[in-house]
Protein backbone atom coordinates (compact mmCIF):
# COMPACT_ATOMS: atom_id res chain seq x y z
CA UNK A 1 0.00 0.00 0.00
CA UNK A 2 1.03 3.60 -0.49
CA UNK A 3 2.37 5.40 2.55
CA UNK A 4 0.24 8.33 3.67
CA UNK A 5 3.41 9.97 4.92
CA UNK A 6 4.13 11.30 1.45
CA UNK A 7 0.77 12.06 -0.13
CA UNK A 8 -2.98 12.07 0.08
CA UNK A 9 -5.31 10.62 -2.58
CA UNK A 10 -7.89 12.73 -4.35
CA UNK A 11 -11.01 11.04 -5.68
CA UNK A 12 -13.35 12.65 -8.23
CA UNK A 13 -16.49 14.35 -6.96
CA UNK A 14 -14.98 14.77 -3.51
CA UNK A 15 -13.22 17.53 -1.58
CA UNK A 16 -10.16 16.91 0.56
CA UNK A 17 -8.19 19.49 2.48
CA UNK A 18 -4.66 18.21 2.84
CA UNK A 19 -2.88 18.87 6.12
CA UNK A 20 0.62 18.19 7.32
CA UNK A 21 0.97 15.25 9.77
CA UNK A 22 1.17 16.21 13.42
CA UNK A 23 4.47 15.82 15.19
CA UNK A 24 4.74 12.72 17.36
CA UNK A 25 6.81 11.98 20.41
CA UNK A 26 6.46 12.24 24.17
CA UNK A 27 5.06 15.62 25.25
CA UNK A 28 5.32 14.97 29.00
CA UNK A 29 7.04 17.80 30.85
CA UNK A 30 6.50 20.35 28.05
CA UNK A 31 5.55 23.79 29.29
CA UNK A 32 2.44 25.58 28.01
CA UNK A 33 4.59 28.16 26.19
CA UNK A 34 6.68 25.44 24.55
CA UNK A 35 3.54 23.64 23.41
CA UNK A 36 2.14 26.83 21.91
CA UNK A 37 5.42 27.48 20.09
CA UNK A 38 5.45 23.94 18.69
CA UNK A 39 1.91 24.32 17.36
CA UNK A 40 2.90 27.47 15.50
CA UNK A 41 5.98 25.95 13.87
CA UNK A 42 3.97 22.91 12.74
CA UNK A 43 1.69 25.04 10.55
CA UNK A 44 2.87 24.71 6.92
CA UNK A 45 3.65 27.90 5.04
CA UNK A 46 1.40 26.76 2.20
CA UNK A 47 -1.63 24.60 2.91
CA UNK A 48 -2.08 22.57 -0.28
CA UNK A 49 -5.85 22.18 -0.50
CA UNK A 50 -7.06 20.11 -3.45
CA UNK A 51 -10.59 20.24 -4.74
CA UNK A 52 -12.59 19.06 -7.70
CA UNK A 53 -13.80 21.98 -9.81
CA UNK A 54 -17.21 21.47 -11.46
CA UNK A 55 -17.26 21.92 -15.23
CA UNK A 56 -19.11 25.22 -15.03
CA UNK A 57 -16.59 26.65 -12.55
CA UNK A 58 -13.36 25.65 -14.28
CA UNK A 59 -11.94 28.94 -15.66
CA UNK A 60 -12.52 29.44 -19.38
CA UNK A 61 -8.78 30.09 -19.77
CA UNK A 62 -8.17 26.43 -18.85
CA UNK A 63 -8.71 25.10 -22.36
CA UNK A 64 -8.80 21.35 -23.00
CA UNK A 65 -8.85 19.62 -26.37
CA UNK A 66 -11.88 17.50 -27.38
CA UNK A 67 -13.67 15.51 -24.64
CA UNK A 68 -13.18 17.32 -21.30
CA UNK A 69 -12.86 14.94 -18.33
CA UNK A 70 -12.26 16.91 -15.15
CA UNK A 71 -10.55 19.87 -13.48
CA UNK A 72 -8.74 20.05 -10.13
CA UNK A 73 -7.31 23.03 -8.26
CA UNK A 74 -4.72 23.56 -5.51
CA UNK A 75 -2.51 26.37 -4.20
CA UNK A 76 1.23 26.39 -3.55
CA UNK A 77 4.13 28.88 -3.47
CA UNK A 78 3.65 29.65 -7.18
CA UNK A 79 -0.02 30.53 -6.86
CA UNK A 80 -3.27 28.79 -7.73
CA UNK A 81 -2.88 25.75 -9.99
CA UNK A 82 -5.35 23.95 -12.24
CA UNK A 83 -4.97 20.48 -13.74
CA UNK A 84 -7.32 19.56 -16.57
CA UNK A 85 -7.63 16.16 -18.26
CA UNK A 86 -9.29 15.41 -21.58
CA UNK A 87 -9.52 12.70 -24.21
CA UNK A 88 -9.28 13.19 -27.95
CA UNK A 89 -11.72 11.73 -30.44
CA UNK A 90 -10.52 8.91 -32.73
CA UNK A 91 -9.65 10.27 -36.18
CA UNK A 92 -9.57 8.17 -39.32
CA UNK A 93 -6.23 8.40 -41.12
CA UNK A 94 -5.11 7.90 -44.71
CA UNK A 95 -3.19 4.78 -43.72
CA UNK A 96 -4.69 1.36 -44.42
CA UNK A 97 -4.37 -1.71 -42.26
CA UNK A 98 -3.44 -5.20 -43.42
CA UNK A 99 -7.10 -5.89 -44.17
CA UNK A 100 -7.37 -2.75 -46.30
CA UNK A 101 -9.57 -0.88 -43.82
CA UNK A 102 -8.76 2.67 -42.62
CA UNK A 103 -6.74 3.07 -39.44
CA UNK A 104 -7.40 5.51 -36.59
CA UNK A 105 -5.30 7.81 -34.42
CA UNK A 106 -6.35 9.07 -30.98
CA UNK A 107 -4.74 11.47 -28.47
CA UNK A 108 -4.95 11.82 -24.71
CA UNK A 109 -4.29 15.22 -23.05
CA UNK A 110 -3.42 16.76 -19.68
CA UNK A 111 -2.89 20.46 -18.97
CA UNK A 112 -1.30 22.32 -16.07
CA UNK A 113 -2.38 25.95 -15.70
CA UNK A 114 -1.25 28.50 -13.12
CA UNK A 115 -3.11 31.58 -11.90
CA UNK A 116 -1.15 34.58 -10.61
CA UNK A 117 -1.83 38.31 -10.37
CA UNK A 118 -1.13 38.47 -14.12
CA UNK A 119 -3.89 35.99 -14.95
CA UNK A 120 -4.05 32.32 -15.94
CA UNK A 121 -1.35 30.84 -18.17
CA UNK A 122 -0.45 27.38 -19.47
CA UNK A 123 2.56 25.84 -17.72
CA UNK A 124 2.61 22.50 -19.56
CA UNK A 125 0.54 20.53 -22.04
CA UNK A 126 1.05 16.76 -21.90
CA UNK A 127 -0.01 14.69 -24.90
CA UNK A 128 0.27 11.04 -25.89
CA UNK A 129 -1.28 8.96 -28.66
CA UNK A 130 -2.06 5.69 -30.37
CA UNK A 131 -1.26 6.16 -34.06
CA UNK A 132 -2.55 4.31 -37.13
CA UNK A 133 -4.42 1.62 -35.21
CA UNK A 134 -6.18 -0.92 -37.43
CA UNK A 135 -7.98 -2.59 -34.52
CA UNK A 136 -9.70 -1.11 -31.42
CA UNK A 137 -8.19 1.83 -29.53
CA UNK A 138 -8.65 1.58 -25.77
CA UNK A 139 -7.55 4.81 -24.08
CA UNK A 140 -8.42 6.73 -20.93
CA UNK A 141 -7.10 8.48 -17.84
CA UNK A 142 -7.13 6.45 -14.63
CA UNK A 143 -9.68 8.78 -13.07
CA UNK A 144 -9.08 8.00 -9.39
CA UNK A 145 -5.32 8.27 -9.79
CA UNK A 146 -4.61 11.94 -9.10
CA UNK A 147 -2.44 13.08 -6.20
CA UNK A 148 -1.01 16.40 -5.05
CA UNK A 149 1.94 16.30 -2.65
CA UNK A 150 4.93 18.23 -1.36
CA UNK A 151 7.32 15.36 -0.67
CA UNK A 152 10.49 17.48 -0.69
CA UNK A 153 8.84 20.18 1.46
CA UNK A 154 9.89 23.07 -0.78
CA UNK A 155 6.37 24.59 -0.83
CA UNK A 156 6.06 23.79 -4.55
CA UNK A 157 3.57 20.98 -5.03
CA UNK A 158 4.06 17.90 -7.17
CA UNK A 159 1.11 16.27 -8.89
CA UNK A 160 0.83 12.68 -10.07
CA UNK A 161 -1.48 11.15 -12.65
CA UNK A 162 -1.81 8.00 -14.76
CA UNK A 163 -3.33 6.93 -18.07
CA UNK A 164 -3.62 3.80 -20.23
CA UNK A 165 -3.78 3.22 -23.97
CA UNK A 166 -3.57 0.35 -26.44
CA UNK A 167 -4.46 -0.84 -29.94
CA UNK A 168 -5.90 -4.31 -29.52
CA UNK A 169 -8.31 -7.03 -30.60
CA UNK A 170 -8.57 -8.80 -27.23
CA UNK A 171 -8.44 -8.34 -23.46
CA UNK A 172 -4.76 -7.89 -22.73
CA UNK A 173 -2.50 -5.48 -20.80
CA UNK A 174 -2.42 -1.86 -21.96
CA UNK A 175 0.49 0.53 -22.08
CA UNK A 176 0.37 2.31 -18.72
CA UNK A 177 2.07 5.64 -17.98
CA UNK A 178 2.50 7.42 -14.64
CA UNK A 179 3.88 10.96 -14.36
CA UNK A 180 5.03 13.00 -11.37
CA UNK A 181 5.33 16.69 -12.24
CA UNK A 182 7.04 19.36 -10.13
CA UNK A 183 7.44 22.72 -11.81
CA UNK A 184 9.14 21.99 -15.13
CA UNK A 185 10.49 18.61 -13.98
CA UNK A 186 8.66 15.48 -15.14
CA UNK A 187 9.33 11.99 -13.75
CA UNK A 188 7.86 9.19 -15.89
CA UNK A 189 7.12 5.53 -15.23
CA UNK A 190 6.12 3.38 -18.22
CA UNK A 191 5.03 -0.24 -18.40
CA UNK A 192 1.97 -2.45 -18.71
CA UNK A 193 -1.24 -2.66 -16.75
CA UNK A 194 -2.11 -6.00 -15.19
CA UNK A 195 -4.92 -8.09 -16.72
CA UNK A 196 -5.72 -11.54 -15.31
CA UNK A 197 -2.28 -11.66 -13.61
CA UNK A 198 -0.51 -10.86 -16.87
CA UNK A 199 1.60 -7.70 -17.20
CA UNK A 200 2.16 -5.19 -14.40
CA UNK A 201 5.87 -4.64 -15.03
CA UNK A 202 7.26 -1.11 -15.24
CA UNK A 203 10.42 0.89 -15.87
CA UNK A 204 11.44 4.09 -14.11
CA UNK A 205 12.72 6.90 -16.30
CA UNK A 206 16.41 7.87 -15.90
CA UNK A 207 15.33 11.15 -14.29
CA UNK A 208 14.52 9.20 -11.10
CA UNK A 209 18.26 8.73 -10.50
CA UNK A 210 18.44 12.35 -9.30
CA UNK A 211 14.87 12.66 -8.03
CA UNK A 212 14.19 14.11 -4.57
CA UNK A 213 13.87 11.69 -1.67
CA UNK A 214 10.57 9.83 -1.68
CA UNK A 215 9.73 10.27 -5.37
CA UNK A 216 10.75 6.74 -6.35
CA UNK A 217 8.79 5.13 -3.50
CA UNK A 218 5.79 7.34 -4.25
CA UNK A 219 5.78 6.34 -7.93
CA UNK A 220 6.23 2.60 -7.40
CA UNK A 221 3.64 2.53 -4.63
CA UNK A 222 1.02 4.19 -6.81
CA UNK A 223 1.88 1.89 -9.70
CA UNK A 224 1.29 -1.19 -7.56
CA UNK A 225 -2.03 0.17 -6.27
CA UNK A 226 -3.38 1.03 -9.74
CA UNK A 227 -1.81 -1.55 -12.05
CA UNK A 228 -4.87 -3.85 -12.03
CA UNK A 229 -6.78 -2.66 -15.10
CA UNK A 230 -9.68 -5.08 -14.60
CA UNK A 231 -10.15 -3.72 -11.09
CA UNK A 232 -11.68 -0.63 -12.68
CA UNK A 233 -14.66 -2.65 -13.94
Regions found by a protein language model. Give the residues of each.
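Bacterial N-terminal signal peptides that target proteins for export
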Residues: 2-11
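C-terminal motif of bacterial Sec signal peptides marking the signal peptidase cleavage site
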Residues: 19-22
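Acidic, small-residue rich beta-repeat scaffolds with periodic aromatic anchors
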Residues: 26-79, 174-176, 181-233
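Acidic/hydrophobic-patterned starts of short beta strands in beta-sheet-rich repeat architectures
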Residues: 78-86, 152-163
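Short consensus segments that form the blades of beta-propeller domains
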Residues: 85, 92-104, 134-139, 166-172
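Beta-propeller blade repeat segments, especially FG-GAP/WD-type strand-to-loop junctions
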Residues: 105, 109-124, 170-193
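Surface-exposed loop and turn segments in beta-propeller and other repeat-based domains
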Residues: 123-138, 196-209
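A short, structured loop/turn motif at beta-sheet edges
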Residues: 147-157, 181-186
Amino acid sequence: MISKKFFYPFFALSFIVLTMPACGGDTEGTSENEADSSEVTDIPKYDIGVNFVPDAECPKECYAEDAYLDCHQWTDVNGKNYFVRSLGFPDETNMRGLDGNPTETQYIYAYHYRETSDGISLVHEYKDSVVNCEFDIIMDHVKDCFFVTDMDEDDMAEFTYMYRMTCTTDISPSTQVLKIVEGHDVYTVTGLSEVFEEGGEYELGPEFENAPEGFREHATGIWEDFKDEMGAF
